[in-house]
Amino acid sequence: MKDIAIIGTGFSAASFSYFIKKDLDFYEKSRGVGGRCSTRRVDNVGLFDHGLQYIKSQDEEFKKFLKDYCVWKGDFKIFQNNRLIDDLGKERIIHENGNNALVKNLFKNKNVMLNKELKNLEKKGDNFQLTFKDDTQENYKTVIITAPFQQAYNLTKQFTESFFSKFDYSMQPNLTLMVAFNKSLNLNLSAISFEDDDVLGFAANENTKKKDLINKDLELWTIQSSLKYSIKNIYEYRNNKPNLIDEMLKSFSTKLKVDIKKDNIHYSDIHGWLYAYSTNSDT
């Protein structure tokens, strides 16, 4: 009988592994570790941090936990009331090889099973039987689920429904546009946060993060949508990518007063996160 299974391989799972000095088995439904700390690699283009943009932390214990990181330097702005103002006083932690490396490094020498999506969790006496999407099964004394709330609830509601019913907890979506230009926008900015905007939430110039891993002839931007825009479009975004890309780029170019022509777009794609971040006050 195995001891402890951890479902998910994001920061929560990595943190648990750091503090619990035991042999643990990790199961990840994707082809790699990281969770929302995700980096898109595009051949002959470069890297997009299309999940976590940066970590804001002054905690020395947390930095010790990370071990391998760097600080994102540059000019950061907030777009508010139709103007750009300085966004000061933050130390933004990133990884120069893509933010996925922040988590990936923490799982070195760990027992990780990839492409293993948990389908069902059943109590068998004093133990739990895990059934995966590939119909394989494993048994453990303890199972810890670090997946987003709704996914964790769906897997455990037969045991925990009365507990979860106490909380008003929800997770919100996000749409993330990745675009590479063959001509610089000449903004000379590292990132912009958009306050109370109908379409945009955040934009990062990837060239200011990982200069050595990006095609020198291209300028890469990751542009995240506002919550309002995400809620409106998350369920149909796969069928509407060209229109959403056009709308987000139009909003971006209008607000920042840059001219973006279609023939200047070398690469573009949009990714939807159904469970991007939490909004709750009870837990």
What are these regions (language model features)?
Residues 2, 133-142:
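Core beta-strand elements of the Rossmann-like FAD/NAD(P) dinucleotide-binding domain
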Residues 19, 38-79:
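N-terminal FAD cofactor-binding segment of flavoenzymes
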Residues 5-11, 18-43:
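Glycine-rich FAD pyrophosphate-binding loop
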Residues 114-129:
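A conserved short coil-to-beta-strand element within the FAD-binding core of flavoproteins
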Residues 32, 218-283:
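Conserved flavin/dinucleotide-binding core of flavoenzymes
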Residues 54-60, 84-105, 236-244:
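Short beta-strand to alpha-helix junction loop
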Residues 198-199, 204-208, 214-227:
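A conserved mid-domain beta-alpha-beta active-site/ligand-binding segment of alpha/beta enzyme cores
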Residues 34, 141-190, 260:
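Central helical "cap/lid" subdomain
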